[in-house]
């Protein structure tokens, strides 16, 4: 995991002319209308209703408000938008019957994007497997892999004239970890490392099959996958136990998935660590020879990698039992992550954190990008598909002064430019999020957007960060 920092001078202030300045969304977090217009159920519907904490309806009412949001994109210099297609809005049961109203909705949405000169970057799965497939085991069941490939192929054909940039999955690590380690997603399993690894492998196999369907189908455009990646640092760089803890989680979150993406298999050191960690929870990982044949072939056709990065992690050795608590309220200091066999997340003195205990250390993005370039020289291009800062965003006198978010974005963009200076090919940056949205585990009090959303009236108000980003996007400079 070592990175050899190349000599870095002051970064160039200028972004390339073709650099994408984007904003990101996800269907379930913005659309609303989760049980109308023919949409089928997903596991989140009943899961959130049973919790009773918050509802995904109406979220940002993007299903009805998207013309407003895309007009704002054009006004504020945002020339790319990450969207996801809700699988169950197209196939209500995951397979079989098609919902024509859902199909037409995305045609209309993509047309509106192009009307406002905003390029859609489209994800096919963003934590929202249709309920009938989820109940059969989600991606631990290989039938879901085939169903996903059928859904993906339908979308490739249906929207071929409107979508150029495709992503198969959003954040395979987050899907696996929140379902099988932290237990904050539907299913709620905690600290089962073998199932987390199996989920990662099976989703990467589904990605590979979809990439081959895209390539062999002769579709125009480009395709890749979005991985949620965090650089891991040992708290004490001279302590072998801390170094091992950092490497354990690095393999679990980063290296296992990146090997699958760019090698199409798993390097011996990756597989040794993965098998050792899976055994901690009493399980094994099923990796078939035919899986690797498919993955190796697909690895040739990844046009880009989407990197979602908000923070890095500092780890120290931990020998106790599992102790996990998700900070879903913004009460600073309440989050805990101690996993048997891996290690413990800790804060480093002098490094700031958000109210949700997320670390603010933009150098971590630089180290991560350089690591990818060094270990996987066959990568072609990277997009920063999510980066941003959750903030409570007080609305006062018709305005939101979110200077901490501006500072966060600016620092990360400067380190991004440093990575580009040393040869990392980055094609664009998407803020999470375009507008304030529903959060899977935080509801509505954790805001990320450029545009403040009054969830009662659905009125949009540009924040200070939107005006700052507009200047950067239009001048392509960091002053």
Residue ranges and their predicted role:
Residues 18-20, 63, 80:
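A common structural microfeature
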Residues 40-76:
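Aromatic- and Gly/Pro-rich amphipathic surface segment
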Residues 85-98:
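Glycine-rich, proline-tolerant flexible connector loops at the mouths of alpha/beta enzymes
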Residues 2-50, 74, 93-95, 103-479:
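Active-site region of glycoside hydrolase catalytic domains
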Residues 65-86, 300-304, 375:
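Catalytic domains of carbohydrate-active enzymes, especially glycoside hydrolases
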